[in-house]
C-alpha cells in the first residue's frame, strides 16, 4: 500500500489506544492463571501484534469480550504439540518460546522471514545448553523438550524481551532460577512493566543488585483484574505532530506510567515545544517556534528513534542520538533504514555504529520514500508531512497495521491530508 500525505496543519484531540506492550503482558499472565481474569479497557483488533499474542494464548485459555472488557477463562487441558503463526511480532515470539518449553510443549513458530532473521541466539544458546531442541530456519523455529530451573544468562544490551520471556516462564518450573544480566540492562522500563504484571498475578521475584533476578519456582499465577494503560509509544507520533504542525490534545494517558516512552514529553519540552497538563488529565502539545537540536540517550527508548528523527529533521542545529545501536535489530535495521527513508525526503542524516546524527534543515522537500516495511518508520514519515513543502509518498505503508489499525483514521482526524 502506498500512502500520500500532503503538507498539513495539525489541530485536534484524540484518545490514545491501549498499550501494545501492556496488552501483550496482560494476555500472557491471565492465560497462565489458574483462575479467571478480567482485562479492562480492552480494544479488540487494535494491532496485528496484539492479535498474534491473543490467538496464541487461546491455546491456554478461552477469551470472551464483553463491552470494553476481555474475560479470560483458563483451560484445564492444552495440546502438547502446537503450530503458532507469529507473523512479524518479535514480542510474541520472544515471550512465548520459554512459556512453551516450561510446559514441555513441542511448538513450531512460523511467520515472516524478516522476523526470523532478527536476533534469537540468546534462546538458541540456552536451549542448547539445557539439552533442548531448538531448530531455527529462515521462516520458522521449532522447539521441544522440558525447560528446567537453572541459571540463565541474558545479554543486557540486546533485547529486554528475552528477559521478559524468561520471567513469565520460570515461575512455572520445579525449582528456583536466576536470570543473570550480562552487561548494562537497556530498555529497563519494559522489564519493569513485566515485573508489574507478574506482581498483579501474585508471582514473586527478587532482584539482587542490578544484574541478577531470582525467580521462585512452583508458583501459580492468580487471575488478574487489570486495566491496560494507553500507549505512550503510539502517543509519541501524535505529540510530535502537534509540536511540528500546530496543536494536539491527547487523552487516556497515565502521566505516572512506567512506560519508558513517556520520555517523549521531556524531549519535546527540551526541544522547545509547549507541553501542558490539563485539569481533565489530558495533555496538550503546541508548536511554538522551530525546535532546537538535542543530544538524546536512546538506551531505554529505542522505539522513539523514528519519531525523534522526524523532530530532529527540521530542528535548529545537530541532534545526536547516542547508544542507538539496538535500533539495528528492530523490525528493520532502523539506523540505516531511517537514514535512507528520511534522506529521500530531504533530511540530512548520518549514522555510525552506535549513533545517529541529524543536521536540521528548515523544511523537508518531500517526495517518494519507503517505510522499509517498518511500522514506526512509516508513521514517523507520515508525521513529517507537517514540515514538508511537498507531498510525502510512502511505499509499504501497510506496515502501520503491525502496531495500529486506526493510525491513519486518527491522523486524518487531527488535520492530516492523507490519500490512500
UniProtKB/Swiss-Prot annotation:
The UniProt record lists the keyword Amino-acid biosynthesis: yes
Entry keyword annotation includes Amino-acid biosynthesis: yes
Pfam hit, one: EPSP_synthase
Cellular component terms (Gene Ontology): cytoplasm
Catalytic activity: 3-phosphoshikimate + phosphoenolpyruvate = 5-O-(1-carboxyvinyl)-3-phosphoshikimate + phosphate
EC number: 2.5.1.19
Main location: cytoplasm
Quaternary data: Monomer.
UniProt function note: Catalyzes the transfer of the enolpyruvyl moiety of phosphoenolpyruvate (PEP) to the 5-hydroxyl of shikimate-3-phosphate (S3P) to produce enolpyruvyl shikimate-3-phosphate and inorganic phosphate.
Family (UniProt): Belongs to the EPSP synthase family.
Protein name, UniProt field: 3-phosphoshikimate 1-carboxyvinyltransferase
Originating organism: Brachyspira hyodysenteriae (strain ATCC 49526 / WA1)
Taxon lineage: Bacteria, Pseudomonadati, Spirochaetota, Spirochaetia, Brachyspirales
Gene that produces this protein: aroA
